[in-house]
């Protein structure tokens, strides 16, 4: 992994194997998201309809890869899992869901919970 925003910020020898694997997964996710963006830009820019179809197919493949990488990360990170479960596949205001979870009022959460946070 080259030195960049995707590089390690601490000495490799100071990092646990789990942190290194998480970093590897995160970099892969970032690369897939970037590829999705690049393909979309190419789709917008091309005048060739057949090339547009090929590029859209490629973009959709990268989208699948991003989803798979995100799911791997969710399975490895309990806090990420919690936040994804809170926000993904909801409707309504994302901010209202967050405010309801933190007890700040707002509208009910999109999951039918009436916006009532954990009682733990």
Descriptions of predicted regions:
Residues 1-120:
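Non-heme di-metal
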């Amino acid at each position: 992994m080259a030195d960049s925003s995707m590089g390690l910020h601490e000495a490799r020898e100071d990092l646990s194997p789990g942190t290194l694997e998480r970093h590897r997964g995160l970099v892969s996710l970032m690369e897939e998201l970037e590829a999705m963006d690049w393909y979309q830009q190419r789709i917008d820019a091309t005048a060739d309809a057949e090339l547009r179809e090929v590029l859209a197919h490629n973009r959709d493949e990268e989208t699948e890869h991003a989803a798979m990488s995100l799911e791997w990360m969710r399975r490895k990170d309990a806090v990420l899992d919690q936040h994804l479960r809170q926000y993904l596949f909801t409707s309504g205001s994302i901010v209202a869901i967050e405010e309801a979870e933190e007890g700040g009022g707002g509208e009910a959460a999109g999951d039918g919970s009436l916006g009532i946070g954990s009682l733990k």
